[in-house]
Amino acid sequence: MISEQTIDNNVEQGIASYVDYLNNIRLADLMNTLESILSNETDKLSDLASKSANALSNLDWAKIEINNLIDSNRGGDTGVHGFISEFAETGIRNARVVYQGLQKSVVLLNDNGPADILLQGKEVQMKFYANILEEIKQASNYDKMSMLFPRDHVEVIEKIMSGAKTVEFNGNVLSGSQINNIRKAIEDESALRGVSYDKWLESSVLKYKD
C-alpha cells in the first residue's frame, strides 16, 4: 500500500510539474501537455479514491477550460494569458485543499466584473504584468478588493518592505530608485486603504512566467 506521505508528495510534485509546464510550452501544446500530467497523476493516485479523485478533477477542470480558451482565443493573443492564469490559479489552489479534505478555497467568477476570483470568500483582482510597479499602480482601481500578483513579484515586494537594500528581480539587482519607487507605491496604496500591504496583497501560486 502506498503511504499517505508518498501520495501527498506525488500530488505536490504533480502540481509543481503543472506549473513548470505552463512556463515552458506554447499555447498550441497546452492541451496535450496537461493531459500527460493528469494521466501521470491518475496512475500515481490510483490507491486514493475520494480525495485523489477530487484533487485531480480540479486539475482536469482547469485543463478543459484552458483548452476552451485556446480554441476560442478569448481575449486575443495577449489577453488569453490573463484568462489562463485565472483558471490555472483556481485549479491548482482547489486541487491542493480538496486533497487535504478541505473545501475549495477559490471560486472563479468569470463574469467580466471587477473581481476575477473569490479567495476564501474575498473578492480578488489578479494582475500579471512584467513590471511590478505597474501592477501596484493598478491597485487603486480596485480599492474595495484584494490584489493578487505573481508569486515572484510578491516575494520581491516582501523583501523591499522588510527593509532589504539589495533585491534581485529576474536575475538583475534592482537599483536604489527602483526599490524606493516600489516601496513608496506600496506605502501609498496601503495609506489609501488604511491597512498594511499584507492585508490587501495576495500571492499567486504561479510565478509571472508560469
Sequence positions of predicted segments:
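Catalytic centers of nucleases
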Residues: 61-142
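Glutamate identity and glutamate-enriched acidic tracts
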Residues: 4, 12, 35, 41, ...
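Interdomain/boundary linker segments immediately adjacent to catalytic/signaling cores
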Residues: 1-85
